[in-house]
Amino acid sequence: MKPSIYSLTRDELIAWALENGQKKFRATQIWDWLYKKRVQSFEEMTNISKDFIALLNEHFCVNPLKQRIVQESADGTVKYLFELPDGMLIETVLMRQHYGHSVCVTTQVGCNIGCTFCASGLIKKQRDLNNGEITAQIMLVQKYFDERGQDERVSHVVVMGIGEPFDNYDNVMKFLRTINDDNGLAIGARHITVSTSGLAHKIREFANEGVQVNLAVSLHAPNNELRSSIMRINRSFPLEKLFAAIEYYIETTNRRVTFEYIMLNEVNDGVEQAQELADLTKKIRKLSYVNLIPYNPVSEHDQYSRSPKERVAAFYDVLKKNGVNCVVRQEHGTDIDAACGQLRSNTMKKDRQKVVAAVAD
């Protein structure tokens, strides 16, 4: 199975070209074909020699993903189900915003974090995606625009799809540098957000990277007892350890942290929990932000339901009265398989049913 050429950073592509007897400018030309002209095959690179194209084909493919399903929402949201070369399935989402087009990418096949409300964790982690497989998601969404003759581009990226990005740290960092490269897609670092469930040691490492990429933390509860009951990760990285890492990140980067807080009816959405959350974030209030997220119900997690608007409003009011910067997140794609991991899970369920039916016949 040949790797995708997207898995190489620009420096790695230059090094590979030099090792294979080519000039540096040839690597620059290839990079330009990939990320500016966005070709889907090496044969389309008209200023590259046939011998070098043959060498490229021998060692690499271009895009390793196959499109299985596309769901388009009435609000313009597009959800993709992609198949990897080994047959594994991943999701990617395009969200149309007033400020541009944002793409949510997946970083792992399955997830081992074990959040009890999340569709992503219904399938345990099978493997990490490599840098090329993550980058390919962006390239196929951009291809969606290009094929429609739309003068539009992917302007924002959120690393919030299936999997824990910091559990696949090295590949995610290579991906971030690839899409941020000024000679390629040139997606601004401040238009990119990476979300973690709270791997404290990786937050510290991320703080030392010197990148301007935004950090979001999936918090979802304001105390250890509740957070440990709905997010297994809290048993390894309790709030004291997590917030020490967050404070280090803020001190090191002087950048704001966003806290994601999914609203679960009568679980974590009471006014007393809102006050706890306000107290928890008080020390870092000037450089923190709370994103209240309406819950997309998952049939396998029927113990949870969406918080009524009245409870969300009351929670929000407590935060605002305490001076917390917060917002209720705008929903996207509510008329399709909206929850992260839901399209993949539902498709795999249907595939299994087909196999069972075929065996029964």
From Swiss-Prot:
Its cofactor is [4Fe-4S] cluster. InterPro entries: Aldolase_TIM (IPR013785), Methyltransferase_A (IPR040072), RlmN_N (IPR048641), RNA_MTrfase_RlmN (IPR027492), rRNA_lsu_MTrfase_RlmN/Cfr (IPR004383), rSAM (IPR007197). It comes from Streptococcus uberis (strain ATCC BAA-854 / 0140J). One of its GO terms (molecular function) is metal ion binding. GO terms for biological process: rRNA base methylation; tRNA methylation. This is Probable dual-specificity RNA methyltransferase RlmN. Its main location: cytoplasm. Belongs to the radical SAM superfamily. RlmN family.
